[in-house]
Every structure is written in structure tokens, then in C-alpha cells.
């Protein structure tokens, strides 16, 4: 498996993973628009197939992780962990020393991953998510 920077050519495949993983997924156009602006994405790839991705909007010295997803059949292979770790490394190399994110309060696998990578809970956004309605934990990492 390799982790590399996402390109616009990856947007359709990434959007398909997004659709499999989220109730309100970004579209292919949403990903290409993000890449045109201040977003940076990494993809995990094996045998020319994208297995997962992580995205972040960057305003140095801060970043906000927008999405982390791994194809359901490839979970439990530490792909999400590797993606977040590479994003943290990239961040430090590019002057980003603080990353924030929101995660569904009931998404314990993701919360555990973030905590393992050094993120701490800052607070809660009530009813942040829709379909289904759920609170979001706000988490932060300081590099």
C-alpha cells in the first residue's frame, strides 16, 4: 500500500468511497472544487485501487480535517490510522501545527483512532449531523 497526494483524476473513485461511508456524501465535483481551493487530500492505494482517503482544509498554521474514509471491506487494516498519521506528518512539514475535526459522537472506532493519534476532545456541537441526527465531538491535535 502507498499513500500519496490525491489528484483530480481520483475524485470519482474517492466520491464512490464517500458514498459508501457517509449519509450525506460529497460529490465528485465537491472533491474537485476542494482541490481547487485550500484543501489537501491523501489517498491510500493498493494495486491501482484507492482504499481510503483523508482530506483537510489548510490555513497555515491550522488545518481542519474534513473527511476520513476507508472502504468497508478494507477496514481493520490500519489504513485510516496510516492516513491520519501521514496527514499529521505532512502538516508539520508545511507549517500546520494545529488540526481540528468533528466526528459523530457515537463513532467510537474513529474517536479511538483520533485519540491514539494524539487528538483531544474540545467540546460538542449539538445536533451537528443529520440523517441520522447526532452530536459531533470537536477534537484537536497540536503538533
Go through each PLM region and give its residues.
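Acetyl-CoA-dependent GNAT
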Residues: 2-73, 84-86, 90, 94, ...
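Short beta-strand "wing" residues that participate in macromolecule-binding interfaces
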Residues: 56, 121-122
Amino acid at each position: 500500500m502507498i499513500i500519496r497526494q490525491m489528484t483530480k483524476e481520483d475524485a470519482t473513485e474517492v466520491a464512490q468511497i464517500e458514498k459508501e461511508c457517509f449519509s450525506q456524501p460529497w460529490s465528485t465535483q465537491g472533491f474537485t472544487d476542494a482541490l481547487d481551493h485550500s484543501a489537501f487530500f491523501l489517498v491510500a492505494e493498493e494495486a491501482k485501487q484507492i482504499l481510503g482517503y483523508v482530506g483537510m482544509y489548510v490555513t497555515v498554521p491550522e488545518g481542519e480535517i474534513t473527511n476520513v474514509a476507508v472502504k468497508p471491506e478494507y477496514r481493520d487494516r490500519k489504513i485510516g490510522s496510516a492516513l491520519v498519521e501521514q496527514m499529521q506528518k505532512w502538516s508539520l512539514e508545511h507549517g500546520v501545527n494545529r488540526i481540528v475535526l468533528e466526528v459523530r459522537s457515537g463513532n467510537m472506532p474513529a474517536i479511538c483512532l483520533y485519540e491514539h493519534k494524539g487528538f483531544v476532545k474540545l467540546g460538542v456541537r449539538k445536533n451537528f449531523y443529520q440523517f441520522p441526527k447526532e452530536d459531533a465531538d470537536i477534537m484537536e491535535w497540536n503538533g
